[in-house]
Amino acid sequence: MTQHPPLTIVGGGLAGCEAAWQAARAGLRVILIEMRPLRTTEAHLGDGLAELVCSNSLRSDDPLYNAVGLLHEEMRRAGSLILAMAEAHRVPAGGALAVDRQGFSDAITRALAEHPLIEIRRGEVDRLPAVEDGPAIIASGPLTSAALAAAIAEATGETSLAFFDAIAPIVHKDSIDFDRAWFQSRYDKGDGRDYINCPLTRDQYDAFVDALLAGEKTMFKEWEGTPYFDGCLPIEVMAERGRETLAFGPMKPVGLTDPRNPGLRPHAVVQLRQDNALGTLYNMVGFQTKLKHGEQARIFRMIPGLENAEFARLGGIHRNTFLNSPRLLDPTLRLKARPHLRFAGQITGCEGYVESAAIGLLAGRFASAEILDAASFAPPPPTTALGGLLGHITGGANAETFQPMNVNFGLLPPLEARPVRPGAKPRVPKGRERKLESARRALVDLGDWLRQPSPWSAEDSPRAALPIPEPTPLGPASGSSE
């Protein structure tokens, strides 16, 4: 029997635990290293694995109309430890999947500790494993220790490891009103269609600034210690520095002409820049913010053209440690400069507990397939939530503006147009219909992926209890939140 090298995993959060589980399912020996309790963080309370720090919610569990719910379902079918333990320790939360934090962490810690192929070690890792140390996955999370962060920065380049994320909201392009917005680059540079522009009159601008100043903000957590710096001020802080600061900053109208009113320059313009290769998502340039999420949606929908905006992601500024993954990682999460290393979890630039665990699941499978020489093992299709998230962080996102991203339907390829009824003109599904059709396609394609020959195919569940809905007759276009 071939003796394979063990897989070393650094970090006992959701991503590291999921990666370890997937590798052990494939029959590999795993060494899982967690620095707590020998070295703690400002945020963690205990020494259990997979400790949920900020919330006990894994968000919506609706697999047909919500992208994170779809990701839940895909992970369940792929034998996810995190989703199995979340189900076992579920607490009432309406349509969300929320868990008893302590029971959840204890159960995952116990499952890994009792697995005969998994060895849990406690201690800080202050350097990246060398080639001779064997294959490794770095899943050290947003609170990576200073020593390991320095080692990662040295290996990737100082500018490639961010310690704070400045997140601007991202809007689904198909929810923008182009009767009011238009495509144009400032001074018509580039191809002239690099930005979407939303104009504001003086009165609209004043009302917008008033709303920003009055909007309810989220405070930094004490342990974040995040300073503001001038290159990344929240939009509401800029407004506090003077009512015209935004009109001379990120909302300046110079070099732009409203084609519907070419003789009158808008008082201000909000620009949105393409955020993914598919062209389905656009980020609001310079709109990083600490406004509460409900306030963001309300206030930003005051902007002409964004009255019915659907947000793939809302903004924020908080402490984080993440790579410029589109530049640094290959499609199987390997560090291009050191391919014996993979990265997983929030450090790759995915945002959220579920997304972190999902990337851990994929990293564990990719590393295992490579160790076992399963060359035919392919990444999940881009039409799935797993594949869409993976594709975004490993190349689909713009490396120049990369910021952490939640899973959302905008990461999946657009649907094809089809007739509402026989003989009718084809159209692309919108709103809830788009989400349902995207989920249906994802689950069908996921089933095909899970059935490919692999170390996991005997235990995966390509066909789960949830029925895969058939394509529905297209009714009137409708909207829904992610």
UniProtKB/Swiss-Prot annotation:
Protein name per Swiss-Prot or TrEMBL: Methylenetetrahydrofolate--tRNA-(uracil-5-)-methyltransferase TrmFO
Gene Ontology annotations of biological process type: tRNA methylation; tRNA wobble uridine modification
Residue ranges, annotated region (Disordered): 450-482
Its job: Catalyzes the folate-dependent formation of 5-methyl-uridine at position 54 (M-5-U54) in all tRNAs.
Alphabetical list of PANTHER family matching this protein: GLUCOSE INHIBITED DIVISION PROTEIN A, METHYLENETETRAHYDROFOLATE--TRNA-(URACIL-5-)-METHYLTRANSFERASE TRMFO
Residues in coiled coil: none
Protein keywords: Cytoplasm, FAD, Flavoprotein, Methyltransferase, NAD, NADP, Transferase, tRNA processing
Organism of provenance: Rhodospirillum rubrum (strain ATCC 11170 / ATH 1.1.1 / DSM 467 / LMG 4362 / NCIMB 8255 / S1)
